[in-house]
Amino acid sequence: MPNFIEGNLKADGKKFAIIVARFNSFISDKLLDGALDSLVRSGATDSDIDVVRVPGAYEIPLIAKKLAASLKYDAVICLGAVIRGATPHFDVVVNEVSKGSAQVSLETGVPVLFGVLTTETIEQAIERSGTKAGNKGSDVAIAAIEMANLVDALQ
């Protein structure tokens, strides 16, 4: 029988940073609420969580790198909403934010979780921030807890 290694869903004793884009705040604030709720329900306290606001999603990777490189956090959670418009701006922002966030995780060894909604419409973003499709902020926070514990288990 193989040995299975996986992270648990206990947040107590872990430190989390949450980066939240202010652009489309009517969505990202709901994602933040979901993330905070999941972290606290899993055992994190307010003093275990730092929330950093940035102007928009494009600014997330730089701040993620600073937070992860500080080694003060067991995981960094990135939240925001990029909604497609009439120009190619959407593709540029989404590509850079997703690649940048992943690169930070690989460079630092700190889990950086991508909770930036990338939707075609405002309705899709609303659905994913607490209505029909659940709250992706909550989902990403749960994944952050699991990844923080998995990284610890592998050390």
From Swiss-Prot:
Enzyme Commission no: 2.5.1.78
Iron among keywords: no
Positions of the catalytic residues: 89 (proton donor)
InterPro entries (UniProt xref): LS, LS/RS, LS/RS_sf
Superkingdom to which the source organism belongs: Bacteria
Catalysed transformations (reactions): (2S)-2-hydroxy-3-oxobutyl phosphate + 5-amino-6-(D-ribitylamino)uracil = 6,7-dimethyl-8-(1-D-ribityl)lumazine + phosphate + 2 H2O + H(+)
Binding positions for 5-amino-6-(D-ribitylamino)uracil per the UniProt entry: 23, 57-59, 81-83, 114
Pathway: Cofactor biosynthesis; riboflavin biosynthesis; riboflavin from 2-hydroxy-3-oxobutyl phosphate and 5-amino-6-(D-ribitylamino)uracil: step 1/2
Enzyme class: transferase
UniProt entry tagged with the keyword Transferase: yes
Residues that hold (2S)-2-hydroxy-3-oxobutyl phosphate according to the record: 86-87, 128
Pfam family, one: DMRL_synthase
Keywords on record: Riboflavin biosynthesis, Transferase
Physiological role: Catalyzes the formation of 6,7-dimethyl-8-ribityllumazine by condensation of 5-amino-6-(D-ribitylamino)uracil with 3,4-dihydroxy-2-butanone 4-phosphate. This is the penultimate step in the biosynthesis of riboflavin.
Protein family membership: Belongs to the DMRL synthase family.
Name the record gives this protein: 6,7-dimethyl-8-ribityllumazine synthase
Organism of origin: Desulfotalea psychrophila (strain LSv54 / DSM 12343)
